[in-house]
Amino acid sequence: MLWLALGPFCAMENQVLVIRIKIPNSGAVDWTVHSGPQLLFRDVLDVIGQVLPEATTTAFEYEDEDGDRITVRSDEEMKAMLSYYYSTVMEQQVNGQLIEPLQIFPRACKPPGERNIHGLKVNTRAGPSQHTSPVVSDSLPSNSLKKSSAELRKILANGQMNEQDIRYRDTLGHGNGGTVYKAHHVPSGKILAVKVILLDITLELQKQIMSELEILYKCDSSYIIGFYGAFFVENRISICTEFMDGGSLDVYRKIPEHVLGRIAVAVVKGLTYLWSLKILHRDVKPSNMLVNTGGQVKLCDFGVSTQLVNSIAKTYVGTNAYMAPERISGEQYGIHSDVWSLGISFMELALGRFPYPQIQKNQGSLMPLQLLQCIVDEDSPVLPLGEFSEPFVHFITQCMRKQPKERPAPEELMGHPFIVQFNDGNSTVVSMWVCRALEERRSQQGPP
């Protein structure tokens, strides 16, 4: 048992902090830090890298008062962990209890053979760590671009792949600080979607990108876009994912209900999978729903996703037009806000237009909040019953309840008659619709 003599929270600056790094099946290593409140997330990862040199650690966890594991993968979440720990220490001191070290649990990426499910390899061209002992420098920069680049290298170092293996073809779109290309991976012959991102971007965008990588490594679902890996060259990071030849749903016109129902099943299953990991998508919209000619439907672009801490969050990110009323109002939100976005997205796909006529979406930019006030003030739009089935109308109506707690929970979504009706595994319906739509698009474009 280890004792810490900690004074009031305001005096923590001068106190010694002991962090106990738990090693799976091998005990633990204690690390003494003399300036705990100034400790950075990057510093902890560097020391974990020395304790576990064979693993690539991208995050770590600690336990809250209920014994639940909370993930730390940024300086902001690091501060939240330290604040929680110091408040616990103060309470223990008041009660005359023994003070335990701060226990953390490294979370390493899966081994390359297990993680890289699509058979590609990755090379970030990263050099070895410059730290040789578990000592933290008090002068390390907290928000430098160099540090962010090193963090990217740390996460992505898991194989052998370079830019010379990639042949870029068409531009698929823009977003989240980068451009997405259709590309050919020469050694494997695979077609990829490659998001290329310049690093001279805002720190907030860097944080979003890091979040996306973390979630892509974690996810293993047939309803989430497949992650091949990434490579780092000069001032660019390239993220390689599965290519969906049908593209995103925002480019399609009005979708028939029998097709939309089967698409909805896949999207709900994808969201339910994320929610089971305590992850909010936060940017559910048609352009982040991809289809292919095989009839598969997958969620993509987790650039604004993050671990759901204590089942609630309070930040401003995402695409305003699809935000739930509580998000537009700046209130707390959780899973039920994703449910609203699900509802308004499928209402748009069913109608072939955005459900609020007074809102003209400006593609690629966030809208002024005053233009979205109608979503907060007005009653939710309703699908016309004469044009759509009663189960579908009810599904959308429930998802778009103004009060978050009145919207369906994940298990209620999967059990809704509309979802149950189309949960038949019939991907042929979606496949035929995608192929037909692509053929119509090609015929309208004419010969090249």
Swiss-Prot record:
Record-given protein name: Dual specificity mitogen-activated protein kinase kinase 5
The entry's keywords: ATP-binding, Cytoplasm, Kinase, Magnesium, Metal-binding, Nucleotide-binding, Phosphoprotein, Serine/threonine-protein kinase, Transferase, Tyrosine-protein kinase
Q: What is the effect of changing residue 315 to D?
A: Dominant active form
**Effect on the protein upon substituting residue 21 to A:** Loss of MAPK7 binding
List, alphabetically, the PANTHER family matched. MITOGEN-ACTIVATED PROTEIN KINASE KINASE 5
The protein's PTM annotation reads:
Activated by phosphorylation on Ser/Thr by MAP kinase kinase kinases.
Task: Give the consequence of mutating residue 311 to A.
Answer: Dominant negative form
Task: List ligand-binding residues for ATP.
Answer: 172-180, 195
Q: What is the effect of changing residue 67 to A?
A: Loss of MAP3K2/MAP3K3 binding
Q: Where in the cell is it found?
A: Cytoplasm
User: Which E.C. number(s) belong to this protein?
Assistant: 2.7.12.2
Report TM segments: none
The chain's coiled-coil residues are none
Cofactor(s) this protein cannot do without: Mg(2+)
Q: Which residues form the Protein kinase domain?
A: 166-419
